[in-house]
């Protein structure tokens, strides 16, 4: 039955919705005592389809839909990591890299995927800095850059605190941005930084006393 249902769709977004609860069954079982080996077979069959279809499903989405997918990607990443299947993990990592590099993916998704790849140590600081430089380029719309930051900084701002080269890129971007653009993105920046723990915010505030006073 599970396998029949899984073959009914190749929609990556629907597959992502299904993944976390199925992995939960593999870890803990359920009250229906579902056959976990059958669940594992289904999961191992549809994750490659998810990876193949992910980028195409996310092309040219608006901000509202992209934010919904952002949460799905974070959940799917956690679920795939729990499985401990190296081949599936490699396929997923490749899909994340495709998301980062595709020009028509929304900035919040590109930022989130960059962050995940950094945390997996698939992007080192240099590779991450390259993506950050591109996202925070003065040639880009300031709102798009701030939205990329929202995705990149999801969960924690510690990577900025512990990686001075990344902090420097943020510093330079805010220092160079015009006053009118800065005022426009203040709500986005506040929303992003408000999600950090009090200790993180205090540390970053100490580092940021200068940079949030643009010229």
What are these regions (language model features)?
Residues 1-215:
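Extended repeat-based interaction scaffolds and adjacent low-complexity, acidic/S/T/P-biased segments
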């Amino acid at each position: 039955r599970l396998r029949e249902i899984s073959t009914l769709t190749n929609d990556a977004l629907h597959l992502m919705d299904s993944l976390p609860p199925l992995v939960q069954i593999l870890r803990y079982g359920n009250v229906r005592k579902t056959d976990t080996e059958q669940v594992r077979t289904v999961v191992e069959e549809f994750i490659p389809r998810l990876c193949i279809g992910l980028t195409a499903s996310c092309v040219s989405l608006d901000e509202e839909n992209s934010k919904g997918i952002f949460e799905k990607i974070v959940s799917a990443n956690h679920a795939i990591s729990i499985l401990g299947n190296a081949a599936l993990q490699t396929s997923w990592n490749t899909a994340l890299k495709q998301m980062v590099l595709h020009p028509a993916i929304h900035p919040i998704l590109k930022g989130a995927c960059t962050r995940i790849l950094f945390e997996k140590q698939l992007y080192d600081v240099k590779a991450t800095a390259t993506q950050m430089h591109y996202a925070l380029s003065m040639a880009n719309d300031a709102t798009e850059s701030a939205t990329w930051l929202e995705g990149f900084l999801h969960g924690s701002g510690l990577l900025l605190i512990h990686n001075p080269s990344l902090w420097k890129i943020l510093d330079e971007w805010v220092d160079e941005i015009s006053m009118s653009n800065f005022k426009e993105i203040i709500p986005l920046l506040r929303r992003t930084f408000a999600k950090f723990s009090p200790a993180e915010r205090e540390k970053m505030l100490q580092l940021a006393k200068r940079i949030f006073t643009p010229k």
